[in-house]
Amino acid sequence: MNANPILLQKKYARITEKFAALENLPLDKALGIFYHSTLYRLMRDGVSDMHCMSDEYLTEDLCREYHSTEQAQ
């Protein structure tokens, strides 16, 4: 299922803002991390209706992905 592009962009913005606040990152860096994440690709491609999940859940998922990627480097 494909979400409305405008609503999806707003969801991306909310997730990025929450992620930046939780990780104490500048918004531009948080946005770059988000757009290079697996989470973004899944949401963009409409996999498993990820866009239907709550902002909090998706932000936590992004934090987990960020920390696992950070540790792998």
Ranges and model annotations:
Residues 1-73:
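C-terminal alpha-helical interaction appendages
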